[in-house]
Amino acid sequence: MDTSHEIHDKIPDTLREQQQHLRQKESEGCITTLKDLNVPETKKLSSVLHGRKASTYLRIFRDDECLADNNNGVDSNNGGSVTCADKITRSEATPKSVPEGLQVSEKKNNPDTLSSSLSSFILSNHEEPAIKPNKHVAHRNNITETGQGSGEDIAKQQSHQPQVLHHQTSLKPIQNVDEGCISPKSTYQESLHGISEDLTLKPVSSATYYPHKSKADSGYEEKDKMENDIDTIQPATINCASGIATLPSSYNRHTFKVKTYSTLSQSLRQENVNNRSNEKKPQQFVPHSESIKEKPNTFEQDKEGEQADEEEDEGDNEHREYPLAVELKPFTNRVGGHTAIFRFSKRAVCKALVNRENRWYENIELCHKELLQFMPRYIGVLNVRQHFQSKDDFLSDLDQENNGKNDTSNENKDIEVNHNNNDDIALNTEPTGTPLTHIHSFPLEHSSRQVLEKEHPEIESVHPHVKRSLSSSNQPSLLPEVVLNDNRHIIPESLWYKYSDSPNSAPNDSYFSSSSSHNSCSFGERGNTNKLKRRDSGSTMINTELKNLVIREVFAPKCFRRKRNSNTTTMGNHNARLGSSPSFLTQKSRASSHDASNTSMKTLGDSSSQASLQMDDSKVNPNLQDPFLKKSLHEKISNALDGSHSVMDLKQFHKNEQIKHKNSFCNSLSPILTATNSRDDGEFATSPNYISNAQDGVFDMDEDTGNETINMDNHGCHLDSGKNMIIKSLAYNVSNDYSHHDIESITFEETSHTIVSKFILLEDLTRNMNKPCALDLKMGTRQYGVDAKRAKQLSQRAKCLKTTSRRLGVRICGLKVWNKDYYITRDKYFGRRVKVGWQFARVLARFLYDGKTIESLIRQIPRLIKQLDTLYSEIFNLKGYRLYGASLLLMYDGDANKSNSKRKKAANVKVNLIDFARCVTKEDAMECMDKFRIPPKSPNIEDKGFLRGVKSLRFYLLLIWNYLTSDMPLIFDEVEMNDMISEEADSNSFTSATGSKINFNSKWDWLDEFDKEDEEMYNDPNSKLRQKWRKYELIFDAEPRYNDDAQVSD
């Protein structure tokens, strides 16, 4: 150890004074960590040095214990002005890599020992040329990366390793060290050899960079993301002798500052955002599908999570896909009726706008807000598009359906559409019930068929006849779509700026701007213009939050990338099949409306044809049945254009003539046939951007036809979708109300063969229900509107006389009730056969009965009567209003969890006032009374026919209550209701009005066999069934008595 003292004596006095000064400061608690004094940094570092390869702070390692135990001076046995370092590995450097003054003993091949003099020397000479990388250190780093253990895991592992006595020095790196102060080579080597023989240093956890987390450790996701990103920074070279990386040549000791974890992570994220924004990306390797199954690509998953965090934190929308259009899917919870209902979002549904229905909603919002509690929340009016071969083909199909409407076989017959390429496609109308699908309304420069056949050559080998047979299978027909640029009047400004540079500009093609410019007589043209806009704006003024929520939900940006926990393997497989890289789904080029309008391109019809072709060919090749294929095809549409905007000018849909000679596989009829009165000319479709050949007219949509037959599904409901559904609706209205020359709301664009029409967007009343139960009741003694033709008047009057409508003011149009494990359904034709008295009362009771106990009836009846009383008073105050053809929709959840407060509320029956297509407001009657074909006889009074129906419902509900409770008064309070039911349970029974004992917890035999009875026996007074239930027939065979007032059916 004498050699060590000699080395110590050769250190200059100035250096020794500096060391004493440092020891004095450390004893005072000023220095608690190992840091480079050359760096002008005053902040204290954390106790843990973060960063991969220890590169965040000069690659200098320090002891976790902060060297706090040896502050009394330099140990005489150590005798050197050195500090601890770690991970000194076998040197493979050339003699030029290490200065001559330093040669490491061969004893240092132990990775856990180190030379303290060497670290001190490197600190003073860190600007020397880089030393050759150490292969052993790099190999060990790779092993650590594979292990992916956190810094805490490494510390725990090292704590279990054998520990030996560690004589530690308290000296820190000095600020300025002169090379001349270092001892000669031979003397220094001998001292180093002596130290390494006598002392074995313990492992130091902070000398190791923090590697990736292990697969089983999910608590360090943010560190994992940061460490993945460090690879993108230019790495510094690694010192082969000490494992210390030298700094880049651009390093300046006076300006360098240590990056903390947060700042480093933020800078790395920003750098990755900038890297990904570059369009020229290196081609990514897509592994084979089998290899993906065996070993998931965890790196891609980490990068995916990184992208999600960046999009949230940085607000980067460059890789988000803003859909320009959405497809409408059939709504399956519909109860009866001809009107097709489609799902727009999870919260909203839409249907064809008929006559003045939107004006009714907007008028009630302005003038009678107290009635809104009974109405579904109105959102607005949508412009909806559908492609068709031509106007002549559309009317031809309409005539064929109209001529064969009494033939039940024609209702399920597929309608053939002959395309210009002679490829006939039969469209099946079975609803799919699939979730909402986002599409891009971008035209293609090339035929979509050619693109698909190029990607999948095997499709070309399929014979056209096979394609036709495949298309006539269970594939649904092409559905209508809502294009964003057609509906500026309803899009919130916060969303519109994503698509346009001038969101505040007035849209020429919107409902709002065109509604005030129509030429024909409308209800509001005689009044104030501002009032008209308020009453006919096409957008709600009350439910703005719901409107914005629905629009954002539908047109929200979609990121086409693999999810962390789903479809990772599937994504790779389909990318391999399609011959594309994963980056293909995240790149997008948009086109400005100006460029699109000046370019000759295919119209939206090709996009529709492409979707149909993909749908049909998915039967040909099972591998094509995947949503990722559809995404890639849609991505091709958007990638076909260049530009900075995603908004397409509507002019481009007329300017292109290529659709007439390009291959097109599927252009089907729109189920969007909105019927609007002739006074509503041009509200939606009329705009400078449209070339319209529309003819004026009205469709008075009605729920009833003269045909007494209907095709039923398993539950008795027939659900149409697609082309046949809307053709049936049109054929009915054309035959009963209006002729072809009256068609006004359907706008044909001859160049693109697009049908543009109006849909009304409403709240989905079944959204929070698990098993929705509904009873559709047609209210009033008059169902035809003020513009109905003579034939329509006569047919509707005869129908009222034959059913319960004339005597009761209400008739049943549909029933759907959950019975423990299945639905009981009845259609409107069944409702027409229901008689006044016990039959009507039995259907009403069966709707409220849950199939388990009579208690369900007892609880529901008071709630329902209370709502009917409130509704009666509100309708009574609507002087001058007429609710012709309106309905009451009674709804509740048949499978609600009573323990949950929200679900329990859904189990309560709710009265909804719907169907205002033929309703007339007071303003309508005042402004256009002389234009009505059949105006109200007493326009200044309330609708007495509707009020009669409300009173009839209350009459039969009260009749059922009195029988079950022995004429007890109605109980509206929930606490009192619970007390009454508890008292009944204690007495085990309740004596009814007939003297029989009724147990509220028991079933009602009269209702239990409702769905099992034969209707012929049901209507035969001498049948065994009628004799069996004779007592109930006598009890409920009652009818409310009304004066035969002529005003009741005005």
UniProtKB/Swiss-Prot annotation:
Top enzyme category: transferase
Record keywords: ATP-binding, Cytoplasm, Kinase, Nucleotide-binding, Phosphoprotein, Transferase
GO cellular component: cytoplasm; nucleus
Gene Ontology MF term list: ATP binding; diphosphoinositol pentakisphosphate kinase activity; inositol hexakisphosphate 5-kinase activity; inositol hexakisphosphate kinase activity; inositol-1,3,4,5,6-pentakisphosphate kinase activity; inositol-1,4,5,6-tetrakisphosphate 3-kinase activity; inositol-1,4,5-trisphosphate 3-kinase activity
Phosphoserine: residues carrying this PTM: S150, S396, S469, S537, S539, S566, S583, S589, S646, S664, S670
Entry's transmembrane regions: none
Biased composition (Low complexity): 508-522
Reaction catalyzed: 1D-myo-inositol hexakisphosphate + ATP = 5-diphospho-1D-myo-inositol 1,2,3,4,6-pentakisphosphate + ADP; 1-diphospho-1D-myo-inositol 2,3,4,5,6-pentakisphosphate + ATP + H(+) = 1,5-bis(diphospho)-1D-myo-inositol 2,3,4,6-tetrakisphosphate + ADP
Ranges of biased composition (kind: Polar residues): 156-173, 566-624
GO BP of this protein: inositol phosphate biosynthetic process; phosphatidylinositol phosphate biosynthetic process; regulation of inositol phosphate biosynthetic process
Acidic residues compositional bias, start-end: 307-316
Localization (cell): Cytoplasm
EC number(s) reported in the record: 2.7.4.21
Predominant location: cytoplasm
Something else known: Present with 1940 molecules/cell in log phase SD medium.
Family the UniProt entry places it in: Belongs to the inositol phosphokinase (IPK) family.
Function: Converts inositol hexakisphosphate (InsP6) to diphosphoinositol pentakisphosphate (InsP7/PP-InsP5). Involved in phosphate regulation and polyphosphate accumulation. Required for resistance to salt stress, cell wall integrity, vacuole morphogenesis, and telomere maintenance.
Listed name of the protein: Inositol hexakisphosphate kinase 1
